[in-house]
Amino acid sequence: MPQESPDDAGAGGPDRNRKVFLRGLKVLWVAMRGEPAVFGVAVFGASLHAAITVASSWVLGRITDQVILPAFADGRTTAAALTAAAAAMLAVGLFKAIGLALRRLYAGLMQFRMQARYRRAVARKYLRLPLSWHHRHPTGQLLSNANADVEAAWQPLAPLPMVVGSLFMLLIAAVAMLITDPVLALVGFVVFPLLFAINVVFQRKVSPVATRAQALRAQVSEVAHESFDGALVVKTLGREDTETERFTAAAHRLRDAQIRVGRMRGMFDPVMEALPNLGVLAVLLVGMWRLSTGAIDPGELVQMAYLFTLLSLPIRSFGWLLGDLPRSVVGWDRVQAVLAAKGAMPHGDGALGGTGGIRLATEGLSFSYEDGYTADGAGSDLADAPEAAGERARTTVLHDVDLEIAPGRTVAIVGPTGSGKSTLTTLLTRLVDPDAGTVRYDGADVRGLAKGAISGVAALVPQTTFVFEDTIRDNVALGADVSDDDVWAALRLARADSFVAALPAGLDTRLGERGTSLSGGQRQRLALARAVVRRPRLLILDDATSAVDPQVEAEILAGLRDTELAATVVVVAYRRATIELADEVVFLDRGTVTDRGTHDELLARSPGYERLVTAYERAAAERAAAAQTETFAETEEAAR
């Protein structure tokens, strides 16, 4: 999803401004086609307001001639004349209010409907795109696309009906002025084009600056989200000042761009305020001369002057619209870049029947990723590459992997860091598709299964657990139609029932953002309960119990084997106790299956496997010794 840098976004000239204007009109046309009825009511209200506004000047002129001047001349007026004048003014005010209410209400309705529609469209697209796409785009940028860019795209819809009504008003006003006095009409015909010319000049000047400001908004959002999301790393490494400076620099660039826009508006607005007033002055000067010659009467002069006064605000609406168009085009482009993004995986219409564990098989499975992305989320090895084909070198992470796992078996995937274990788990659940080869469930190619078929039978518990800011019940059920008994059963299987039962509100306990009120092991056990509550036929654990006490981990894995769940279990394992519980061990090294068998068989015949398991044990012993030393030191400190 390539998007302009802030500096590129600010570049431009007359040709670019013309293109921005034309493309802005196309964006508005999309909205008009999307909400024709609502737009029609808003334009009707704006046109009613415009027509009554022009009519009000005629009413004021008639009142001047028939009520005010006779009252000054004779010192009195009739009740009938006063009643008629009051009724006319009341009718004018009432119809103007109706038109204004319809215009504002339905313009807002149109704007907010389009924003909601495209926010939903962006969110749906995000959920359909594969992980590889998300790993290539910062979360802050995605948030900006769904919020600030959608708002900017449809910002011009607020003044749009007013602009259409203003065009109608100018047409009626021009006819009224020509009928009243062609000479005074010429004065207006000089002022109005000048106002339009100033609006066009302003739009050309402000367009590149407003475009750059919109791009900088996304940049600020990206930096802020990255800093907040990495708060733990920032604090532990003492990088608060560096991150503050980075955010400050981005915020200052946005501030400077917005100040430039403000300065331009500061020069533009006074001119737009002054010109209509100068037009009124010109009308009065020329009108006094015309009045002295008897060409017009006092009421017609009042009518013309009042009309000029009323037209200043509608004319300014053109400036508001033109000023919003550059940001609208930038927002629209960024939203469309998301909606047009490629990478969504095709699905077939196949279904999976049966019960019990899945027969899982892979045939010639190979996968490569774009350089700069890794499977742990620091980038991604899950590249879907159509967008970036040819732009990056690719590194093979899995090559010709063949597996056959019988239903109900537990298989441990063991291998050194970077051997492709996590990538394999994402391929097994079809979070990405392989470059070559096939993954089969009960003999069926997963690419031929209907959408939702895989998630209906398989569950993946990843390395990094995610806990929603919600209740424990909703975190475990996560939208599934399960009873509280099912939730408690899943919690017991994940050995999470004891700590949940100890909480004051039990299942109704609300967890903080990302489950910060829980320990790492508790979060992992909740994630495991979330997976097993759906009673999957295939359960994949990607180092999903690394933060759990080894004894508890052994109980969990033993429970998975003994339960009636009877799922096929694939576990990425690092602890010897975990590996020993598996029916079979697959040793993965440099993206290739180098050996497979029981734990004892691999220890006996695979030197690489033996070295790796020994290293795991040594690291575990060192961590245990360090924890024991820390506990002893804390006990001694407390005793003192």
Residue map of PLM features:
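Membrane-integrated ABC transporters
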Residues: 1-53, 68-85, 95, 103-107, ...
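Short intracellular "coupling" helices and adjacent cytoplasmic loop segments at the cytosolic face
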Residues: 4-16, 112, 120-144, 148-150, ...
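Juxtamembrane helix-loop junctions of ABC transporter transmembrane domains
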Residues: 11-21, 44-45, 52-65, 88, ...
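An intracellular "coupling" helix at the cytosolic face of ABC transporter transmembrane type-1 domains
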Residues: 30-36, 131-132, 148-160, 205-216, ...
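Transmembrane helices of ABC transporter permease
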Residues: 34, 38-48, 95, 161-212, ...
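Alpha-helical segments in transporter systems
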Residues: 37-58, 89, 154-166, 188-189, ...
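Helix-loop-helix
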Residues: 70, 176-190, 264-333, 338-339
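ABC-type nucleotide-binding domain
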Residues: 355-640
